[in-house]
């Protein structure tokens, strides 16, 4: 399983998570035991970076003109700064209305009905990975980035070692240098000893 794979890899190299989830969502999804294997990460597509006891939060302006009766809004924050908004909007007309108003703002907006997500306009996973690698002096030719979605390719392509998980989108598996098979992990990761 991937949980066993992560536990195994964490014995040899530092792990960092890169996800579109907020840090709180990632902690809930992975569970405390798995989340604690990561030394930090890129959260909310780069809205929050956590590494080596430091953080960089890219705040998002307050959403003032959204009717909270028509949208369930969750503000994801770190030390009092909101770095991601998630909105569940079930009414199609209201979604269209909200999306048109958000396009006028300096945000990145992601939309997958009924969910609308808002983050800072200047962040992404690629920039987050590059920032952490530079801050921690990780040579890019010694970094492995694992992804499961074609949206991860931009982040994966900046390092020498890219890896798709077994159930990744087929095009990502074609582009990635490796495919991660958790059943073969012990042989795969011995290069770091």
Where in this protein do the model-derived segments appear?
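Active-site phosphate-binding/coordination module
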Residues: 2-76
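Asp-based, Mg2+/Mn2+-dependent phosphohydrolase catalytic module
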Residues: 158, 162-193
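Conserved acidic, metal-coordinating active-site core of Asp-based
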Residues: 67-158, 167
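Hydrophobic/aromatic beta-strand patches that form the interior of the parallel beta-sheet core
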Residues: 16, 42, 144-146, 163, ...
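Short, well-ordered alpha-helix to beta-strand connector turns
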Residues: 12-13, 38, 45, 82-83, ...
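Hydrophobic packing residues within well-ordered alpha-helices of enzyme cores
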Residues: 26-30, 98, 155, 172
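Conserved Rossmann-like nucleotide-cofactor binding loop
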Residues: 23, 151, 170
